[in-house]
Amino acid sequence: MTIPFRVGQGFDVHALVTGRPLIIGGVRIEHSHGLLGHSDADVLLHAVTDAILGAAGLGDIGRHFPDTDPRFKGADSRVLLREAMARVDAAGWQVVNVDATVHAQAPKIGPHAPAMVANIAADLGIAHDLVNIKAKTNEGLGYLGRKEGIAATVVTLLARQA
């Protein structure tokens, strides 16, 4: 039986540290802290990448772009997302939609969401109205509420290519 649709879920979290730029959804945001990681540590794009790879049955971001590989040191996560999308496409899938939540006590994500939507839509080759980004604080609770990190969760739907 051929299944015409697949759902993928992605999650990522990175610690906030001084001395690094803050890049979320491919958008550089002015902030006192940035995200720590091997690449540019774009928590949102990493979660999107995991969601599309997972839905296509292709594993996760670590399988394709391991943080032990020096080629990905400081890598632009938009480049990684486009490469992951090429692999999803080669496997016969297309993205139907992306629904994402960025979990951050600070900074405010809302003002940057339209640019993030535009980046993700462009990198996945889909219309802007097929990408949704929400922002949530942790109401001061836990490591996110203490502003020690930022997390992202993503759900995506893929359809078999016609």
Swiss-Prot record:
Oligomeric state and interaction partners are given as: Homotrimer.
* Keywords (A to Z) from UniProt: Isoprene biosynthesis, Lyase, Metal-binding
Instruction: Name any one Pfam family assigned in the record.
Output: YgbB
Enzyme class, spelled out: lyase
Task: Pinpoint the site Transition state stabilizer.
Answer: H38, T137
- List cofactor names only: a divalent metal cation
Task: Print the organism lineage.
Answer: Bacteria, Pseudomonadati, Pseudomonadota, Betaproteobacteria, Burkholderiales
Q: Where does 4-CDP-2-C-methyl-D-erythritol 2-phosphate bind?
A: D12, V13, H14, H38, S39, D60, I61, G62, F65, P66, D67, T68, D69, R146
Protein name per the record: 2-C-methyl-D-erythritol 2,4-cyclodiphosphate synthase
- Kindly give the PANTHER family that the UniProt entry links to this protein: 2-C-METHYL-D-ERYTHRITOL 2,4-CYCLODIPHOSPHATE SYNTHASE, CHLOROPLASTIC
